[in-house]
Structure formats: structure tokens, C-alpha cells
Amino acid sequence: MLPNHPPLVVAEQFGTLETLYPGRIDLGLGRAPGTDMRTLQALRRDPQDAERFPSDVVELQGLLSDTSPLAGIEAIPGKGTNVPLYILGSSLFGAQLAAALGLPYAFASHFAPQALTEAVALYRREFRPSEVLAEPYVIAGVGAIADEDAERANTGWRRFLTFNFVCGFVVTMLLIWLWVLVP
């Protein structure tokens, strides 16, 4: 949710964590605001901040390195900590950005399981090696239902599928209704 926070503030916060716990901190960067408009306003952020996500990632990467991209501005602490960055996503946009920047990519397939294969293939195909990563590195978050009893696990899975089908149907019908009836 990088659009909710200025890169300098994130660099200082994660620089502090890295200073306290060296080698134990990773930073996942997502583009989605993850909030409603009122909360976004309370954070003093603009809905268009998500459009600056790629440049904010590059700026943050620079603030955590030894060379700040902003003349006369340094993240203290943060400068030189080189906290590992991961691009988080559930669409092809995140895969393309992670590939272009040579960063690891974590795909939220529990949000968009149908896009997992295409996003990972795109990331691997377009990956450009960088100073931080020589080869593509993918993490996939997946939804799973587990139980010691197979029948209870299967029941949980069927409930999950039914819930998602009903929710998807309702959202689709609402969108069709809005598209057809609202000018």
C-alpha cells in the first residue's frame, strides 16, 4: 500500500527496523490503496498516488541505498540499509513492474487465482536482472482449506467455492445493472 505513504517515510520506518533487526526485514510494496476514500483523505493522500507507484518504488529503492534520488534528502535511518523490496500484486501490472525493475514478485493468487499462471509467466519472460536479483524470484500466496478430516476439508472447500460464486454473481449483476440503468 505504498500509495498511502510517502517513500521517504517508508524508507525511514523500514530503515529503523533494519537497523534494529539486521538481515531480518523485507519490504513488500503493493499499489492498491487498501482503504476507502475517507481513510485515504485522513492519510492526506490523493487517489492518483497509485499512478505514481512505479516512480515511488524507484525513489524508495534509492532512499534505502547509498545514493538518494532526491538532491539533499537522505532517509535517516534508512540510507544504506538496502532493505530487500518485493513487488506485491494480483494483476499483470505488478508482474511487469517487478520484471522491469529486477525485483522479486509476490502474487496474491488468493485474490485472483485465474491470473496466477499468466502473471508468473509474464514476470519470468520479461525479467531483467538487476543489482539485487540475477534471476526471477516468485512467491505465490494461495488459499487453502485444511483439516485433519478429509470430509470436513472438502465441505470447507465447497462452502468457499459457493461463497465466491454467489459473491461474484452478485457483483457481476450489480455492475451490469449499473452499466445498463445508470447514465
Predicted features along the sequence, with ranges:
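Acidic (Asp/Glu)-rich catalytic clusters
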Residues: 14, 18-24, 97-100, 124-135
